[in-house]
Amino acid sequence: MTAGPAAASAPAGPAAASGSAAAPEPTRPVPAPDERSAPYWAAAARHVLTVARCARCSTYVVPPDHTCPHCGSTDPGFAFEPVSGRGTVRSWTVVRQSFLPGFRGEVPFLLVDVELAEQPELRVIGRLLDGPDTTLRIGAPVAVAFEDVADGVSVPAFALAEPSATGPGEVRS
């Protein structure tokens, strides 16, 4: 799934009247992979969600650090492994104002806190691509989707895996 910046509206004021070109819409920020995160971003560019896994205790960890928070190993040998991308919504928020110029044309949007199916409390945050007026509930099933934000750069996001049924705990954003 792809998404890009919203088209800039026509400028108002003297510049529009004189025919001057409007300033280009700022682009979204893109990841700047470092040595530790490069495998994650390379997989994301192929639309594959990966999570770091400790070589000592096999626990998935987001984000990987110098020490495994589960077993305490100071030499966790984290390796990024593909995961299903399936999970459930644990929480969400509606972003209505962006302080980053590259997102100004895209508000409002939903950010979801997702618990991945691979492990209890394995949580990641991403944009929900179903739109800001989507009806959500805690426990709603989601699946990974990807936003192609630049050539060769994709960012993991989520989409509802099935329509939310009306019922207890359902909230309209």
Language model region names:
Residues 62, 75-79:
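Short functional micro-motifs and their immediate structural scaffolds
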Residues 78-88, 138-140:
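Short coil-to-beta-strand transition motifs
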Residues 48-51, 58, 65:
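Residues immediately within or flanking Cys/His clusters that coordinate Zn2+
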Residues 1-51, 159-161:
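A broadly conserved sequence feature marking short terminus-proximal activation segments
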Residues 90-129:
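Glycine-rich active-site loops that engage anionic ligands at enzyme catalytic sites
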